[in-house]
């Protein structure tokens, strides 16, 4: 039997079981847990390579082979870190395993034929497309910015650069909901809209759900009262949608205990649960201890750095229509920004007590940095806190699974879309992000949307090869024309689907219905289900978890930062 060195094998086919890969310039290392390809039968495309007629490519018709295969990919997902080929058919994941020609090769689960395209993923990492559940639809250009960061699904609300949308993620009322669904029909990402949940009588909420929203947003700027919270959750239970909450910073209509009483044990997604983005001051962070609370962070406080506190005051004044010349407005802003709770937030993520990350796009958050900042937190916690107790080897595999779940499977579960997106699993939409390890989490090599390349770095269009400078991210065919409608999903409530909203609005994109929004619990948050006892000292703002003081040091240097953005 012929032998090949590990290094030569990795150079040719990518890493295999036992090999380790560094993620970007962080201190995070992953180790390959399993290899679903077959040694000696690996497929690879190119001159003199395997995927040729009668060799790795068979004679079957299109119906019997995949449309796309990603060869020798290193999959990083909540369920594992595995080397495999990934087959895609009709825009969905067909199989994860061994690609090739079943007529002459063993163990083939992904048949390659004349109808099959190849993306070479040797030496590359492949992740599921990210999901950002805190989108202020201030401008449509956010979709492309999100896409080039590896986010393929955007959930939120708004109508454009209006004062209401600058501050809140609400698309209010049937007319705006209809117009936003029509506008978003041409965006190259999956979308779901949130309606305005701030009313105390149910009919105004029911009509928004019937018009097409997949959730209701309760925001303090519209009045986050116990009555509004109870009403929104009552309608949500009735119509199987999610409720997202930005609670009452000023404690005007009650304290965190009153809000929890109004929630009454029902499932709810609490936005920026640390509090700098808004919520009961100073102790909204304690909500994440409850079994029905699905807590998320927005990215301006992630990770905690020397600049975090100074940056926040001006951001808050702009986004929430506050006047720096009014003392009460300044006091309101300052009450939300607490060094101690921000310092605790990173640790709560590392413990798995906070379950999701998101952006708060153009409204105190950066739409293109959800993925990047999530991994910066993971790096900071590795450096400050060392290996997690759950790790089973000399690697960071468990920590990596915990953090990737925060922007993939957990937001999908939270908003009832996990049957369609959120992980690399058979049957789900083929929203896949391909990364070179050195650029992991920062700049994707390719973003695949519904089985087609939607955006990718591309060199000089007049060059003789695709790689000469200047290289820019450019929309690809999966984001153009009517092809995009076959490669994306518009999420609707069951009531909207039954109401014929897609047909009435002439939506051309595929429609998917949210489900299971009311039964999901904190315990269902993958790798992020911890429910500790959390207390906040109302005088010092110190945070304690099960009696232990929780804090972290502000970062003065971060990975995945300036060195990646010089050009």
UniProtKB/Swiss-Prot annotation:
Q: In which pathway does it act?
A: Nitrogen metabolism; urea degradation; CO(2) and NH(3) from urea (urease route): step 1/1
GO CC annotations, alphabetized: cytoplasm
| Reactions catalysed, as given in the entry | urea + 2 H2O + H(+) = hydrogencarbonate + 2 NH4(+)
- Residues in the active site? 320 (proton donor)
Please give the chief subcellular localization of this protein: cytoplasm
What post-translational events are described? Carboxylation allows a single lysine to coordinate two nickel ions.
UniProt-annotated location(s):
Cytoplasm
Task: Give the cofactor note text.
Answer: Binds 2 nickel ions per subunit.
Give the InterPro entries listed for this entry.
Amidohydro-rel, Metal-dep_hydrolase_composite, Metal_Hydrolase, Urease_alpha_N_dom, Urease_alpha_subunit, Urease_AS, Urease_asu, Urease_asu_c
Q: What are its E.C. numbers?
A: 3.5.1.5
Q: Which Gene3D superfamilies does this chain map to?
A: Metal-dependent hydrolases (3.20.20.140), Urease, subunit C, domain 1 (2.30.40.10)
A Gene Ontology BP annotation from the UniProt entry: urea catabolic process
Question: Does Metal-binding count among this protein's keywords?
Answer: yes
Q: Where does Ni(2+) 1 bind?
A: 134, 136, 217, 360
Q: Which cofactor does it need?
A: Ni cation
This protein's superkingdom?
Answer: Bacteria
**Where does the signal sequence lie?**
none
Q: Which residues form the Urease domain?
A: 129-567
What are the N6-carboxylysine sites (modified residues) in this protein?
217
Keyword Hydrolase belongs to the record? yes
Q: Which residues bind Ni(2+) 2?
A: 217, 246, 272
GO terms for molecular function, please?
A: nickel cation binding; urease activity
**Subunit composition?**
Heterotrimer of UreA (gamma), UreB (beta) and UreC (alpha) subunits. Three heterotrimers associate to form the active enzyme.
Note the PANTHER family from the entry. Answer: UREASE (PTHR43440:SF1)
Family statement drawn from the similarity comment of this UniProt entry: Belongs to the metallo-dependent hydrolases superfamily. Urease alpha subunit family.
This chain belongs to the protein called: Urease subunit alpha
- Organism encoding this protein: Klebsiella pneumoniae (strain 342)
Q: Which gene encodes it?
A: ureC
């Amino acid at each position: 039997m012929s032998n090949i060195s590990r290094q030569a094998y990795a150079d040719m086919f990518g890493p295999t079981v036992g090999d380790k890969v560094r993620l970007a310039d962080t201190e995070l290392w992953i180790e390959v847990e399993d290899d679903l390809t077959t040694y000696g039968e690996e497929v690879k495309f190119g001159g003199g390579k395997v995927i040729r007629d009668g060799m790795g490519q068979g004679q079957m018709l299109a119906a019997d082979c995949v449309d796309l295969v990603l060869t020798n990919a290193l999959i990083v997902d909540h369920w594992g870190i595995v080397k495999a080929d990934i087959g895609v058919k009709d825009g969905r994941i067909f199989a994860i395993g061994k690609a090739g020609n079943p007529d002459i090769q063993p163990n083939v689960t992904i048949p390659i034929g004349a109808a099959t395209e190849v993306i070479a993923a040797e030496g590359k990492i492949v992740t599921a497309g990210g999901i950002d559940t805190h989108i202020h639809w201030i401008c449509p250009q956010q979709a492309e910015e999100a896409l080039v960061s590896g986010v393929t699904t955007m959930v939120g609300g708004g109508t454009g650069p209006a004062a209401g949308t600058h501050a809140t993620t609400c698309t209010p009322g049937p007319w705006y909901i209809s117009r936003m669904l029509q506008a978003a029909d041409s965006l190259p990402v999956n979308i779901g809209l949130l309606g305005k949940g701030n009313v105390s009588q149910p009919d105004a909420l029911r009509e928004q759900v019937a018009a097409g929203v997949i959730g209701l947003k309760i925001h303090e700027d519209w009045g986050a009262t116990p009555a509004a919270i109870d009403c929104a959750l009552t309608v949500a239970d009735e119509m199987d949608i999610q409720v997202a909450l930005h609670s009452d910073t000023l404690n005007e209509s009650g304290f965190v205990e009153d809000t929890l009483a109004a929630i009454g044990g029902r499932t709810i997604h609490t936005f920026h649960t640390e509090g700098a983005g808004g919520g009961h001051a100073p102790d909204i962070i304690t909500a994440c201890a409850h079994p029905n609370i699905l807590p998320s962070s927005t990215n301006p406080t992630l990770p905690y750095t020397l600049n975090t506190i100074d940056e926040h005051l001006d951001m808050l004044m702009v986004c929430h229509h506050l006047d720096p010349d009014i003392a009460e407005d300044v006091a309101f802003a300052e009450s939300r920004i607490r060094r101690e709770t921000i310092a605790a937030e990173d640790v709560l993520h590392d413990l798995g007590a906070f379950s999701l990350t998101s952006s708060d796009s153009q409204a105190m958050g950066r739409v293109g940095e959800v993925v990047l900042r999530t991994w910066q937190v993971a790096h900071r916690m590795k450096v400050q806190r060392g290996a997690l107790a759950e790790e089973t080897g000399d690697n960071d595999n468990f920590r990596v699974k915990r953090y990737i779940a925060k922007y993939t499977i957990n937001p999908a579960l939270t908003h009832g879309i996990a049957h369609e997106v959120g992980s690399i699993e058979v049957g789900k939409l083929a929203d896949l992000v391909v990364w070179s390890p050195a650029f992991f989490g920062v700049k994707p090599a390719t973003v695949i949307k519904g089985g087609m390349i939607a955006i990718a770095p591309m060199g000089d269009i007049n060059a003789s090869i695709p790689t000469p400078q200047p290289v820019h991210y450019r929309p690809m065919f999966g984001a153009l024309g009517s092809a995009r409608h076959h490669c994306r999903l518009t999420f609707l409530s069951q009531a909207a689907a039954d109401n014929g909203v897609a047909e009435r609005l002439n939506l051309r994109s595929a429609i998917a219905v949210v489900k299971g929004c009311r039964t999901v619990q904190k315990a269902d948050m993958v790798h992020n289900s911890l429910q500790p006892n959390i207390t906040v000292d109302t005088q010092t703002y110190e945070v304690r978890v099960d009696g232990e003081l929780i804090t972290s040091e502000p970062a003065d240097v971060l990975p995945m930062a300036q060195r990646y953005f010089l050009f």
